């Protein structure tokens, strides 16, 4: 346990001291401690000669106590209750040594970017992966898996999306009504003629998280059959396509 000294350097009570810094008796309760440089600067002006050593010690301690009260004052906390607070609670969190994680409040939906992509002659899987990356927000340096950080993506000309190989006739889409014998199966060509938007939605949904966040992110995808879309007010920009093999070679 540290002790008080009346010399040129001062030592302060440790966390196990039963008498608090502000004069209130506390049983086995940590007290408010302060950094040495700040306290030394506060009592530097009190280094003057005195006729009595005991008087000098008392005067230095009084000035030190007043300086600490002024510097680390907590207006909303009574003086006799400040022993319950640590230095971090008095001066604020240590932001330099604490990892910061973005919260959902840091990303307002009205501030998100809007992208538009023309699906004409684009490979379905490669286009869907690019869309999922931007909806998820993985293209951002501050990406956090648990936060909605992505953008909105608009897909036009969904009926002109392309696939490679023999997927037009071999790729199957299945759905079930939930009743006995309710399994329905159709090929890529059949579904593209019936509901072309569902093909892109199915591909992107499978690349998003499975859960509440994934269901919320899926609402950021807007797919349209033709070349027009009703989101001109959002001023969408072209989706960056960096995959050189994303377009079908003719």
Curated annotation (Swiss-Prot):
UniProt KW Electron transport keyword: no
SUPFAM superfamilies to which the protein is assigned, alphabetical: Ribosomal protein L13
Keywords per UniProt: Chloroplast, Plastid, Ribonucleoprotein, Ribosomal protein, Transit peptide
This protein's GO CC annotations: chloroplast; cytosolic large ribosomal subunit; ribosome
Compartments (UniProt record): Plastid, Chloroplast
InterPro entries: Ribosomal_uL13, Ribosomal_uL13_bac-type, Ribosomal_uL13_CS, Ribosomal_uL13_sf
GO biological process: negative regulation of translation; translation
Intrachain S-S bonds: none
Entry coiled-coil feature ranges: none
Molecular function terms, GO-annotated: mRNA binding; structural constituent of ribosome
Protein family membership: Belongs to the universal ribosomal protein uL13 family.
Record's subunit section: Component of the chloroplast large ribosomal subunit (LSU). Mature 70S chloroplast ribosomes of higher plants consist of a small (30S) and a large (50S) subunit. The 30S small subunit contains 1 molecule of ribosomal RNA (16S rRNA) and 24 different proteins. The 50S large subunit contains 3 rRNA molecules (23S, 5S and 4.5S rRNA) and 33 different proteins.
Protein name according to UniProt: Large ribosomal subunit protein uL13c
């Amino acid at each position: 346990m540290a002790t008080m000294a009346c010399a040129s350097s001062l030592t302060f009570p440790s966390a196990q001291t039963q008498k608090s810094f502000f004069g209130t008796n506390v049983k086995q309760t940590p007290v408010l401690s302060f950094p040495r440089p700040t306290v030394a600067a506060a009592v530097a002006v009190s280094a003057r000669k005195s006729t009595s050593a005991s008087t000098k010690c008392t005067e230095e301690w009084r000035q030190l106590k007043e300086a600490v009260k002024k510097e680390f004052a907590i207006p909303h906390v009574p003086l006799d209750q400040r022993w319950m607070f640590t230095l971090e609670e008095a001066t604020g969190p240590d932001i330099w040594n604490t990892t910061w994680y973005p919260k959902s409040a840091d990303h307002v939906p009205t501030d998100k970017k809007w992208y538009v992509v023309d699906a004409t002659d684009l490979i379905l899987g490669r286009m869907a992966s690019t869309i999922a990356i931007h909806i998820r927000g993985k293209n951002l340096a501050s990406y956090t898996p648990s936060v909605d950080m992505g953008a909105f993506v608009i897909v036009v000309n969904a009926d002109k999306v392309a696939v490679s190989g023999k997927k037009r006739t071999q790729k199957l889409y299945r759905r079930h009504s939930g009743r006995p014998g309710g399994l329905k199966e159709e090929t890529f060509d059949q579904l593209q003629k019936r509901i072309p938007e569902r093909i892109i939605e199915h591909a992107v949904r499978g690349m998003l998280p499975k859960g509440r966040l994934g269901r919320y992110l899926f609402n950021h995808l807007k797919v349209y059959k033709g070349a027009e879309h009703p989101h001109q007010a959002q001023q969408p920009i072209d989706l960056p396509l960096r995959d050189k093999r994303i377009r079908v070679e003719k």
